[in-house]
Design a protein with these regions (language model features):
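SAM-dependent methyltransferase
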Residues: 145-215
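Conserved class I S-adenosyl-L-methionine
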Residues: 1-51
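A short acidic, Gly/Pro-enriched loop at the edge of an enzyme's catalytic core
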Residues: 100-110
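C-terminal lobe and adjacent flexible extensions of AdoMet/dcAdoMet transferase-like proteins
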Residues: 209-251
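A short SAM/SAH-binding and catalytic strip from SAM-dependent methyltransferases
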Residues: 109-125
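A short glycine-rich, Lys/Arg-flanked "PGG" loop and its adjoining helix->strand segment in the class I
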Residues: 128-140
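Class I SAM-dependent methyltransferase SAM/SAH-binding core
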Residues: 52-99
Length: 251
């Protein structure tokens, strides 16, 4: 159920960091933070959808000043409860339109969106607005990095629109795609040991790499790098995800 925290209320925030998914593994977080620290180049970083600080906190420990934008107060409270969480500034709001005052500390050398978070913006207009918002916060030469999946439409059998992506003895999850609008919804079903079930759904809008490049162009940014992941392996037709970096021209 959606509330003022969007789809990431207290129930989600409480268990968010207990995920066993690949993006939550320490070695993956370390690689992610290493690349982001290099892209920041000694400047400030802006995380869109900072959440519980999974990436922001270790990045800050590397000496990179981090500020976040986050809609969910519950997720921010989770970050505040962690060591170092109180020191990170957060602006509460939609990261497509929320602005950060840069008059005191200057513009950012890096903005970033990880773990498919660009897809939480459920319209093309909002995704374009996000790029423009980022461009307004970046210093000349600054970078915008996005980690996002490549839409898995090749997995959908002809005539179907459902792709399961998780099954276990206590739960399952699947995505329902609308290939006309590029809208999709992830459905999560869980059953406790005593047989009590729960379900939640999260909508998103999937987006293609070339579409992201056009959004960047509309915002005055240009593609600098695109990799298969944080190990900087080449992006190919078989890549299931990509890390893309766009740059704000110096002049």
């Amino acid at each position: 159920m959606i509330d003022e925290d969007g789809y990431f209320g207290e129930d989600v925030a409480e268990r968010y960091d207990r995920s066993s998914g690949p993006s939550f593994q320490p070695d993956v977080i370390e690689r992610t933070v290493q690349v982001l620290a290099e892209l920041a180049g000694g400047g400030r970083a802006l995380e869109l959808g900072i959440g519980t600080g999974r990436i922001a906190l270790p990045l800050a420990r590397r000496g990179v000043p981090v500020h976040g934008i986050e809609l969910s107060r519950a997720m921010v409270a989770g970050m505040r409860a962690k060591p170092g969480g109180e020191a990170i500034g957060v602006s509460i709001g939609d990261f497509a339109t929320t602005t950060v005052d840069t008059r005191a500390d200057g513009a950012f050398s890096l903005a970033y969106l990880v773990f498919n978070t660009i897809m939480n913006l459920t319209s093309q207009e909002a995704q374009v607005a996000c790029f423009r918002n980022v461009a307004a916060h970046l210093e000349p030469g600054g970078c915008f990095a996005i980690e996002v999946m490549v839409p898995e439409l090749r997995k959908i059998p002809a005539g179907q629109n459902i792709v399961p992506f998780h099954t276990s003895p206590t739960g399952w999850a699947y995505t329902v795609y609308d290939t006309v609008t590029q809208d999709a919804t992830c459905h999560y079903v869980e059953v406790t040991e005593d047989g009590v079930g729960s379900a939640r759904s999260v909508p998103f809008r999937y987006v293609w790499p070339a579409e992201l490049d056009l959004m960047a162009q509309l915002a005055g940014l240009r593609l600098r790098d695109r990799w298969d992941g944080w190990t900087r392996e080449p992006f190919t037709e078989d890549s299931a995800q990509h890390v893309s970096v766009w740059e704000k021209p110096v002049s």
